[in-house]
């Protein structure tokens, strides 16, 4: 066990494209999407101990700790391995909840990766991803730490190398429940499947965007504004929208034109997750294999 406090990034992600191809027999949606990480996100500071208990600070209003994905991830790791160690976990929350940029899933993945290291459990990425999949469909991509093309119901991941562009990410002041979008009767569910090579060479889109813009005027307004300046899309099921640029200065020049009451940030796309890079640094410092 490593008992000194360590700090770990919990990065945001974007769905650079998202297409819905159909439904499985049990009602889940089949999709094709491209995940890329951002160099922007939450932070978890974790101190391992021998108490056997997981404590999480600060408290989140209206969310019992046992329902928090960080706590669930730590508890699942204990049960999977029989580990009797504990940890104090402090979350520095930057990413919005319900924004479509992976906040909760990223938090869960960071907890799994960090505690596997601190408790010296030796689980592989595959084993951690299996635990993570039970917590949320997006958790495995954060665990594996590489930009990825996802297919099926999101469980089939192929590493990808999209261009690492700069993004202006804007969060309209609305909370969007994924279930509301995926159950909408007008949602496109029959986009033909295409190869990754074909998709990377095509104009990117998001099959959820039309529905979200229709039922959430604030999203429609913000996306219409961004489209004046650059290619722009919804990420996931929203509410965040993003515009892509070739340089940081271009993105920041448009950010400067936003109203002060609009929540937004500029970040660069990363094909290797900041979490994976941090783990490599800690392993190197411990002289352990990467």
UniProtKB/Swiss-Prot annotation:
Known pathway: Isoprenoid biosynthesis; isopentenyl diphosphate biosynthesis via DXP pathway; isopentenyl diphosphate from 1-deoxy-D-xylulose 5-phosphate: step 3/6
Enzyme Commission number(s) of this protein: 2.7.1.148
Broad EC category: transferase
Residues involved in ATP binding: 96-106
Active site positions, chain numbering: 13, 138
Alphabetical UniProt keywords: ATP-binding, Isoprene biosynthesis, Kinase, Nucleotide-binding, Transferase
HAMAP family from the UniProt entry: IspE
Family listed: Belongs to the GHMP kinase family. IspE subfamily.
Job of this protein: Catalyzes the phosphorylation of the position 2 hydroxy group of 4-diphosphocytidyl-2C-methyl-D-erythritol.
Protein name (database record): 4-diphosphocytidyl-2-C-methyl-D-erythritol kinase
